[in-house]
Amino acid sequence: MRIKKMFVGLKNVILNPKKSVKMWRATVMWKRAVAEADKKRSMDGHRYFVIWDAAQHKLISITYDIYKGRGDSYQYLRARGAFKRPLSREELKELCFYYTGSQWRAKGCSAEVREEKLIEWQKFYLKQKV
C-alpha cells in the first residue's frame, strides 16, 4: 500500500511538476507559519490563529487579544480594514488554517484537525495566483 502511494505521488510529480512545486511551497509556508504561531504562543501564552494575508501574500499568525500598536492583533488589523466584518473567536477559528492553545486551557489543533487544516490550506493556495 505504501509503495502504491509512493508511485502515485511520483506519477503526479512527473505529470504536473508546476502543481507539485506549488504544493511543496504551500506545505513549507504552512509549516513555517505554524512554527511561528507556536513560538509566539510559548512566549506570551495567548492563542494564535494562522491566516492568509492577501496584502503580503503570505501566512501570518495573529491573536484575538487586544494589543496597543501590535500588528499581529486581530483588533489592530480589523481597525485598519483587513477584515470586512467583525468575527468572533469561533468564526476566526473556522476560517484560519491553524490555531494554537492558550494559557487559559483553550485547546489547540489536534492531529486530525491539523491534517485537515493543512489540506484546506493547500487547496486554497493552489487556487491563488501567487
Annotate each predicted stretch with a short phrase.
Residues K4-R32:
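Basic, mixed-charge low-complexity alpha-helical segments
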Residues R25-H46, L87-C96, R114:
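A short, charged, amphipathic alpha-helix used as a generic interaction element across diverse proteins
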Residues S42-Q56, V130:
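Short glycine-rich, low-complexity/disordered patches
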